[in-house]
UniProtKB/Swiss-Prot annotation:
Family annotation (PROSITE patterns): COV_M (PS51927)
Job description of the protein: Component of the viral envelope that plays a central role in virus morphogenesis and assembly via its interactions with other viral proteins.
UniProt-listed Pfam families: CoV_M (PF01635)
Domain of life: Viruses
Source species: Avian infectious bronchitis virus (strain Gray) (IBV)
Gene: M
Membrane topology term: Multi-pass membrane protein
One Gene Ontology MF term: structural constituent of virion
Virion surface domain ranges by topology: 1-18, 71-75
Record key words, sorted: Glycoprotein, Host Golgi apparatus, Host membrane, Membrane, Transmembrane, Transmembrane helix, Viral envelope protein, Viral matrix protein, Virion
InterPro entries: GAMMA_CORONA_M, M_CoV
The protein's name: Membrane protein
């Protein structure tokens, strides 16, 4: 007969005492990721957070498979199968949507597990600036401050006000949302037009094109 491997309270306490430093460091690591892992705060920590979130799905699937192999009882086996199938379908669905988005915008932000949209600004100097965005807004307002372009609070690139295009884009797996510049404000209180600039882009149209084809003429808003 197989031995019962359940830990008693004394063994659990001893195990915690032995690994408490590791547990403390691991919890601190997760706390820093969750609290400071935003694209507007630290791009490095944010990317690390995305990697950790991505690893959770394979980990869930692996634990689910183990639960199916070693179920506590019949009810536990049924629950383990349902949860494992759900985890597998969710992970496959994530990859399908991410690959569709990558095909549309050619940005690694397509694999961001926190979002299903990527913003793209094709500067007139040839640079392409991509940024993570949680949803598809009606208005975007990128700014240039001291020669640096920001959008949605994220540092994108060094550029001049004249480098901003007439249209910018927010891509989703099935749509390309096109934003047209409707207003432009340049200059600060000192009159320096290169130091600060604000641009207002309003949602103009929606189509199913990719960023390689930027023709927007004749597109209606919900085609």
């Amino acid at each position: 007969m197989a031995e019962n491997c359940t830990l008693d309270s004394e063994q659990a306490v001893l195990l915690f005492k032995e690994y408490n430093l590791f547990i403390t460091a691991f919890l601190l690591f997760l706390t820093i990721l969750l609290q400071y892992g935003y694209a507007t705060r630290s791009r490095t920590i944010y990317i690390l957070k995305m990697i950790v979130l991505w690893c959770f799905w394979p980990l869930n699937i692996a634990v689910g498979v183990i639960s199916c192999i070693y179920p506590p009882n019949t009810g536990g086996l049924v629950a383990a199968i349902i949860l494992t199938v759900f985890a597998c379908l969710s992970f496959v669905g994530y990859w399908i949507q991410s690959c569709r988005l990558f095909k549309r915008c050619r940005s690694w932000w397509s694999f961001n597990p926190e979002s299903n949209a990527v913003g793209s600004i094709l500067l007139t100097n040839g640079q392409q600036c991509n940024f993570a965005i949680e949803s598809v807004p009606m208005v975007l307002a990128p700014i240039i401050k001291n020669g640096v372009l920001y959008c949605e609070g994220q540092w994108l690139a060094k550029c001049e006000p004249d480098h901003l295009p007439k249209d910018i884009f927010v891509c989703t797996p099935d749509r390309r949302n096109i934003y047209r510049m409707v207003q432009k404000y340049t200059g600060d209180q000192s009159g320096n037009k290169k130091r600060f600039a604000t641009f207002v882009y309003a949602k103009q149209s929606v189509d199913t094109g990719e960023l390689e084809s930027v023709a927007t003429g004749g597109s209606s808003l919900y085609t």
